[in-house]
């Protein structure tokens, strides 16, 4: 099956047709899911997702290895020879409509229709012919897209065997796709008795670099273990998980920007945003007043308030108020006011990594990687700087201007190590990260709280509870817990677009599994609660009992005569009492609760200066107590 799936630019997915059901290792769990059916369901689910989340992406479905053939206006009944035999273009590469999604769903659910289209061919399919067909589709339908990708889903790791001519032709066609800017990504399906081996054929046609940016870390090695499914359900889930993890291409935030290490010493880098919060956004306005919903096109018109005359664009001037007067600026002058120079990343100094607090990362970090387009040798210099920062645990302070007319940003450039999973698959490539540093107004002061430490028995028992509730291998995988509100938003839009029933409640995978929690840690939680009661009783028993009884004042002889106000006598506290009180607040980290008079009395008793504001007094008291006690 070839699924031509296009993302912001384009993508195509292929799988050689295999209708044989996959045997299940579990005899109680029978499965009748063939790789072809699983791949079609995967394409259908992806089309459902992308039609809502990325409505401008182009997606297509191309089947290969079929007995029937279809390519645009050609079919089995056309005159002459077929251009691409055994290739069936089920859905053309285009922005998918609701009708095309329903057709693909019908193919997945309708067995009779699927048997006609998914009938395997008797002859082997030429991969060179298939790749040339894909080349024609991309050239005709998406000639100007930056990111075009071909997803190949197959369980045949050696389609041509020892036929060197067919293998050589396929290699040439794959190079043509690479030169065209198409990235080929493989999703192998391993059989129970045979593991998929990419070295037999597919390593020769899949390039490990992006065609648009050969130096960018765009290649991800296929995860064969993920697709080593033993039944149809796990096969489908594995395909969806694998494709979803690579469904979004790494788009460059900027390309070929100068990284200035010193005067007249520059290299070129490209920047990527690898982590970004995904939110539901309104892409257009829809008019519901007619028989069918239509996309509304907004038009803005400026009208004079006094005469209702339409104001032309050249009549509008922008001004700023200075001293009560309006000072007008021309568009060129406004641009010059916002011009801080050409886009650049300039290193202005270095600091230890320990000086960068964890709370300084309040915006999206920027991942940068070297490119050789502007300056030859950039990769070598970048690698040397990366290794030096990583080895010495340093960060570089940079002056960063993202684009023209953008405000400059002070950032910390730090080296990030490569991260791989348990199978050795790269998850995060090695490179540099630029973290925009916050200004003083961006950081709030934490509220002052007293540190309360629980008794050791409570801590020990809670440690057991936490160990029972840890995630597998102690690692949180965000891909297993999608944003429930965002998915619910997409699910409603999908139901409206495909004329489906609106679901009653969302599928929220972030809700705790209370039964499983009770089964694994319920007994330990009850033991912890009993220990909490014991510790509370022990703490309250050590404290003196307080009373709410108050002594009544003596009755006056003449109730009509107002009693004189009681005289307040100021109790003079000794130096020992002040020291004990200050020491107590120091241990509880609540020195700020003391009054200025108390702080000055304490400093005077210690022979220190008592002049200054409260902040200065607190600083002197802390220095004194840290050195003395």
Curated annotation (Swiss-Prot):
Molecular function via GO: ATP binding; ATP hydrolysis activity; damaged DNA binding; DNA helicase activity; telomeric DNA binding
Start-end of Acidic residues biased regions: 1-18
EC number of this enzyme: 3.6.4.12
Domain SAP: 591-625
GO biological process: DNA recombination; double-strand break repair via nonhomologous end joining; telomere maintenance
Superkingdom field: Eukaryota
Pfam families, per database record: Ku, Ku_C, Ku_N, SAP
Bias kind Basic and acidic residues: ranges: 19-31
Location of region: Disordered: 1-33, 543-575
CC terms in the record's Gene Ontology section: chromosome, telomeric region; Ku70:Ku80 complex
Reaction(s) catalysed by this chain's protein: ATP + H2O = ADP + phosphate + H(+)
Ranges where the Ku domain occurs: 259-468
PROSITE patterns, per the entry: SAP
CDD domains documented for this protein: KU70, vWA_ku
Keywords from the UniProt entry: ATP-binding, Chromosome, DNA damage, DNA recombination, DNA repair, DNA-binding, Helicase, Hydrolase, Nucleotide-binding, Nucleus, Telomere
Presence of the UniProt keyword Cell division in the record: no
InterPro entries from the UniProt entry: Ku70, Ku70/Ku80_beta-barrel_dom, Ku70_bridge/pillars_dom_sf, KU70_core_dom, Ku_C, Ku_N, SAP_dom, SAP_dom_sf
Subcellular location: Nucleus; Chromosome, Telomere
UniProt enzyme class: hydrolase
Entry's family note: Belongs to the ku70 family.
Subunit annotation: Heterodimer of Ku70 and Ku80.
Protein function: Single-stranded DNA-dependent ATP-dependent helicase. Involved in non-homologous end joining (NHEJ) DNA double strand break repair. DNA-binding is sequence-independent but has a high affinity to nicks in double-stranded DNA and to the ends of duplex DNA. Binds to naturally occurring chromosomal ends, and therefore provides chromosomal end protection. Required also for telomere recombination to repair telomeric ends in the absence of telomerase. ku70, of the ku70/ku80 heterodimer, binds to the stem loop of tlc1, the RNA component of telomerase. Involved in telomere maintenance.
Protein's name according to its UniProt entry: ATP-dependent DNA helicase II subunit 1
Annotated source species: Emericella nidulans (strain FGSC A4 / ATCC 38163 / CBS 112.46 / NRRL 194 / M139)
């Amino acid at each position: 099956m070839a699924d031509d799936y296009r993302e912001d630019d384009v993508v195509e997915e292929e799988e050689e047709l295999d209708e044989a059901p996959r045997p299940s290792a579990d005899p109680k769990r029978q499965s009748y899911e063939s790789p072809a059916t699983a791949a079609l369901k995967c394409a259908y689910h992806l089309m459902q997702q992308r039609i809502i989340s990325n409505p401008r992406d182009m997606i297509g479905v191309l089947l290969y290895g079929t007995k029937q053939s279809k390519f645009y206006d050609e079919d089995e009944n056309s005159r002459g020879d077929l251009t691409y035999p055994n290739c069936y273009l089920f859905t053309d590469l285009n922005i998918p409509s609701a009708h095309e999604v329903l057709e693909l769903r019908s193919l997945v659910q309708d067995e009779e229709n699927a048997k006609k289209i998914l009938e395997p061919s008797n002859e082997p399919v030429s991969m060179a012919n298939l790749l040339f067909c894909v080349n024609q589709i991309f050239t005709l339908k998406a000639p100007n897209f930056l990111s075009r990708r071909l997803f190949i889903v197959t369980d045949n790791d050696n389609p041509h065997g020892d036929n060197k001519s067919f293998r050589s032709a396929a290699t040439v066609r794959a190079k043509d796709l690479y030169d065209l800017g198409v990235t080929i990504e493989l999703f192998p399906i391993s059989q129970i008795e045979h593991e998929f081996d990419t070295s037999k054929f597919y390593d020769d046609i899949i390039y490990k670099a992006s065609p648009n940016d050969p130096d960018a870390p765009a290649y991800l090695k296929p995860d064969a273990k993920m697709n080593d499914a033993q039944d149809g359900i796990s096969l489908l889930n594995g395909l969806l998980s694998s494709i979803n993890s690579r469904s979004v291409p790494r788009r460059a935030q900027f390309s070929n920007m100068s990284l200035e290490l010193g005067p007249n010493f520059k290299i070129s880098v490209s920047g990527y945003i690898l982590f970004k919060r995904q939110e539901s956004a309104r892409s257009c306005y829809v008019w519901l007043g007619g028989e069918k919903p239509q996309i509304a096109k907004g038009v803005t018109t400026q009208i004079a308030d006094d005469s209702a005359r339409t104001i032309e664009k050249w009549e509008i001037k922008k001004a700023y108020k200075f001293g009560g007067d309006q000072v007008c600026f021309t568009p060129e002058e406004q641009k010059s006011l916002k011009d801080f120079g050409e886009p650049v990343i300039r290193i202005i100094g270095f600091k230890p990594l320990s000086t960068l607090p964890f709370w300084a990362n309040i915006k999206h970090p920027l991942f940068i990687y070297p490119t050789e387009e502007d300056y030859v040798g950039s990769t070598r210099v970048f690698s040397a700087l990366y290794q030096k920062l990583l080895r010495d645990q340093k960060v570089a302070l940079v002056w960063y201007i993202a684009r023209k007319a953008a405000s400059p940003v002070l950032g910390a450039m730090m080296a990030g190590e490569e991260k791989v999973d348990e199978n050795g698959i790269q998850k995060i490539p090695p490179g540099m990260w630029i973290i925009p540093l916050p200004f003083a107004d961006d950081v709030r002061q934490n509220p002052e709280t007293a540190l309360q430490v629980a008794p050791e028995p409570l801590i020990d028992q809670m440690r057991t509870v936490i160990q029972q509730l840890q995630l597998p291998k102690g690692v949180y995988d965000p891909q297993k817990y999608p944003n429930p509100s965002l998915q619910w938003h997409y699910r409603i839009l999908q139901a409206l677009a495909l004329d489906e029933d609106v679901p009653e409640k969302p599928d929220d995978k972030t809700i705790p599994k209370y039964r499983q929690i009770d089964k694994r840690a319920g007994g330990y939680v009850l033991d912890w609660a009993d220990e909490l009661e014991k510790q509370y009783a022990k703490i309250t028993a050590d404290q003196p009992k307080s009373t709410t009884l108050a002594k009544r004042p003596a009755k006056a002889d003449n109730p009509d005569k107002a009693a004189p106000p009681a005289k307040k006598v100021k109790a003079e506290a000794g130096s020992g009492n002040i020291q004990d009180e200050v020491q107590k607040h120091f241990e509880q980290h609540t020195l700020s609760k003391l009054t200025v008079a108390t702080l000055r009395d304490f400093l005077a008793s210690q022979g220190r200066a008592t002049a200054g504001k409260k902040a200065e007094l607190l600083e002197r008291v802390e220095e004194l107590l840290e050195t003395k006690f």
